[in-house]
Amino acid sequence: MFDCAIKNGTLVDGSRKKPYKASLYIKDGRIAEITADDSKAARTSFDAAGRVVSPGFIDMHSHSDCSYLTVPTHEGKLVGGVTFELVGQCGTSAIPLNPRNKADTLRYVSSNFSTKFDPETFPATDFDGYASHIEQFGVS
């Protein structure tokens, strides 16, 4: 028996093949089978008829560094299919935070978010602090 089944979806698999109807069967956290057969047993089953099933998307240039400090679930990314996000590479990241520019940097970063970051209570100023905060509070 499979752990999970996603049945009757339109599969877009990233291989440049045309989308096709299929059922995915998952065992031990991995896709074990992709088939047109939707009759196989699974502990949990989802009907994906009328929906697209695809691998998760990678966001290679985002500005979500600080978002994860205030909204760790970040549902918007998940709803859009993003399952991996690279942060901190654009030059406007708040991490690492130069102590001399802390107030100005946080004011600038806050201008892009509904949350205003207080320089006195900002939870992370270096990579270790950021990683520790993310580890403690988690992300989706």
PLM region spans:
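Di-metal (Zn2+ and/or Mg2+/Mn2+) metal-binding site signature of metallo-dependent hydrolases
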Residues: 52-76
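Histidine-rich, glycine-flanked metal-binding segment
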Residues: 1-5, 11-56, 71
